[in-house]
């Protein structure tokens, strides 16, 4: 449900049969007595991942006594308390949660019936391991464009890895049940196992073989989670504490540690070899194969394999998912590493000519301040070359502008201004007060970065050579003029910076050396008649030493 903004929807067609997340009415799930005692309807309690609660090791007394995160208490977290709560013993915690969950008064009659049916089915199956395969929620939604976001990469469970786990259980005296929302892909895995005589049909199943087909999506989910809890082992994606919340919930229902991540079984080198060997065997949707090639690309970089090999993998990923601009970003990055600037320039020009460049640019900033593509962006943001690459510089200008690095943006623009006319790209938008207002109005960080103090400090700190020093008066003159114009234009607009989500982050920017140095310069010019300008070099040196000391 927390990923609903990524348009993860149920998809049923000739080729795809995938169930997305869904939520049932609370009164349909829980009993009247349970809701009366525990249900909170206060609209002031917003969605929250509980990051603050598990941000440090705490004690029982600490979380029971004020000050709390909010006046009413704490937001809960999906990270189990034995990771962050002192003296919380794992085995004891799991047993307590299991006993609470098994209370007959929690669920409505319909859901209690599902709960009871699961117990009957489990007795018939007897001794099974579960493969909890996640992937459809990523490959069938815009999440696949967030390929750099660690938590999403950790949630993905490649079918190629699942196949290998099954192969390693051929001689085990247990049954295997394949769990997951992608019904068709699960069936393809099952059929491959049976047709290739890896396991007989009475040894391996998909969870759909046990599900009442009249269930709605949430009832299916409830059934799956409860059946999964009975598994001897649950193979899941995820690293360390950040495993799938679905699998972890099944573990808590079980009251024992029965989940194991495939990362704990296979080294990165083994994962690379397994995906490479099994890719294409199951006849999965091309989006899965594209993701598998991206996994090979990512692993090849971690394992320090050749750049040419990495480039080949990301090209194959692009061929199979042509709408995924995340792959384009990684292709460009690989070309940067290879020093093939001509290939990057050509690729960007093709996107421009086909009106697809903006899609790539928006994918760069898709995670906003999290900057999941920071490593790739930095190649553009700090780009310097003696040769002429207008497209690369245009992307650098665009990124600097959208991240509030207006000084760097202006300098890149001045150096390449005469080349942009031939490209037919709009560069005037970077100098429009109207466009600037729209850019910064929803970000406290960008508002602060647009302060003259920050920009003046950046002008001095970003001087890298003699040419930069010579241009200082010209650049300062421009930003003084810009500041005057924007001050007049923004006068009629109210920026309620304290109410913006990134306000706390913006406060830290005010303490940056660049901001403090710019502020000192402005104060010195305002107090020139008191001799402040003469003291400026000394005061700047003292400021530098103070900030450097504070960083330690």
Feature locations, PLM:
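Leloir-type glycosyltransferase catalytic cores
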Residues: 266-340, 366-368
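Boundary detector for helix-to-coil junctions that initiate low-complexity/charged tails
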Residues: 387-552
